[in-house]
Amino acid sequence: MNGILIVDKPQGMTSHAVVGRIRRLFGLRKVGHAGTLDPLATGVLVVALGQATRILQFLMQENKVYRASLVLGKTTDTQDSEGQIVATSDPGHIDAQSVADVCHSMVGSYDQMPPMYSALKKDGVPLYKLARQGVEVSRKPRRITIFDLQLLAVEPPNITFDVHCSKGTYVRTICHDIGVKLGCGAHLTALRRLRSAPFDVKEAVTLEAIELMAPEDRPELLLSIAEALREYPSLNVCPEGIKRLGYGIPPTADMIADTIDFEEGTQVLLVGPGGALAMATYVPSRARESRGDFELLRVFNDGGSS
């Protein structure tokens, strides 16, 4: 059983716990997920089953959309409501225009400092474990992009907004930084992932709904590898190219049934009659001894025949 399942993660569960539940519900050991959600958060969690775990690296590259709520005037050690309050300030002087100006200033690319309470590791140890021991270590800021930030409600001290951001962005740090810029502190109180790559929360299914389904019906929820990678350009491979792929050899451009009209370096999905064959990078200029006009990134056993 191979495929992608879009789960609406409930509040209070870790992403790892969701994966464990899916393992039991589908009777599979090989299950993984793309893009961790904190226990506080809900919404889109992309779960891969079987051979589909091989495409997680491509799904993790995509941008995300979140709906977040914050409260002004209180700073916590975790930057969210699950932490301890470490500072307070009266936000009574904050008006809607000040909030709008600060939120507008957040749009763009900048270096974001990851919080100590995160799954990032220092010398193999997760930062959150060090933080719980009262240890703070230096972290390297990471380049992130906020493509859009739309205010939905401004009722100080409570603010709700939607944010479209690049992978690896910490939304609770956005909330913390908004509080810093407003001069009163802030922390995240609610977070829902509305979209991850092409996957919208409207197509997500709850764990409760999966449990209520008959076991034999659950595979109907799965997206194929080709469907999950639908945002990548796809190329149909001729039988000769499919045979080469079976030996791990990339096809040449003349083994592609479609017109290749994109730039060198583009990541593409190679497909056959039955679905996905491989993810590859188009590199027509590579040395001839490398064989083929593509560099294979991942090969699947999905699409060689109908």
Curated annotation (Swiss-Prot):
Pfam families: TruB_C_2 (PF16198), TruB_N (PF01509). Its EC number is 5.4.99.25. Keywords: Isomerase, tRNA processing. GO terms for molecular function: RNA binding; tRNA pseudouridine(55) synthase activity. Coiled coil: none annotated. InterPro entries: PsdUridine_synth_cat_dom_sf, PsdUridine_synth_N, tRNA_psdUridine_synth_TruB, TruB_C. The keyword Chloroplast does not apply. The active site is at D38 (nucleophile). SUPFAM superfamilies: Pseudouridine synthase. It catalyses: uridine(55) in tRNA = pseudouridine(55) in tRNA. One of its GO terms (biological process) is tRNA pseudouridine synthesis. The keyword Cytoplasm does not apply. Belongs to the pseudouridine synthase TruB family. Type 1 subfamily. Responsible for synthesis of pseudouridine from uracil-55 in the psi GC loop of transfer RNAs. This is tRNA pseudouridine synthase B. It comes from Syntrophotalea carbinolica (strain DSM 2380 / NBRC 103641 / GraBd1). The lineage of its organism: Bacteria, Pseudomonadati, Thermodesulfobacteriota, Desulfuromonadia, Desulfuromonadales.
